[in-house]
Amino acid sequence: MTAATLTTPDHLPRRMAVVVFLAFALAYFFSALVRAITATLSPTLLTEFSLNAQDLGLLAGGYFLGFSLTQLPLGRWLDRHGPKKVVLAFLSFAVLGCLAFSWADSFHGLLAARVLCGMGVSACLMAPLTGYRRWFDASTQLRTNSWMLMTGSLGMLAATLPVQWLM
């Protein structure tokens, strides 16, 4: 193999690129929604679990604790296993975290679930960016990265009034 062969990305056909983008964008939307939903759920959490502001802050921080615990090994896992496998594996932890959060009957259960959610969604931005670097040309990467960030913003918006309507 020549050096040129090693550095040439495997560009995806257009249809497959759209499917890959939509799958990754949905995961990042979910990540942003889970990150921001604690604020929307706070009135319910305050009453049902008798929490105070400090507890709510710790719940919000639990997400970031879980998120940060995986960041150093995440790069190695992305390089070794690829973005598709890594994001699927991580999202399974996010689903478990969301289920655990819904079944929690104590503050400690909520906190453990938030940490698990944070760990689970921690690959939802870096995995797509890694995949886009591998599979898209440079001009397409700029657009897809921008659209990904917009999708995350929509996830944060979805965690507000739409979630309140569902409650």
Task: Specify the residue positions occupied by each region the protein language model found.
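Helix-loop-helix hairpin linking two adjacent transmembrane segments in secondary transporters
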Residues: 148-167
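Conserved MFS/SLC helix-loop-helix module at the cytosolic interface between two early adjacent transmembrane helices
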Residues: 69-105
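Extracellular/periplasmic helix-loop-helix junction of adjacent transmembrane segments
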Residues: 41-68
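Paired small-residue
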Residues: 97, 108-116
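Residue-level signature of mid-helix packing/kink "hotspots" within the transmembrane helices
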Residues: 36, 64-72, 156-157
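Extracytoplasmic
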Residues: 19-51
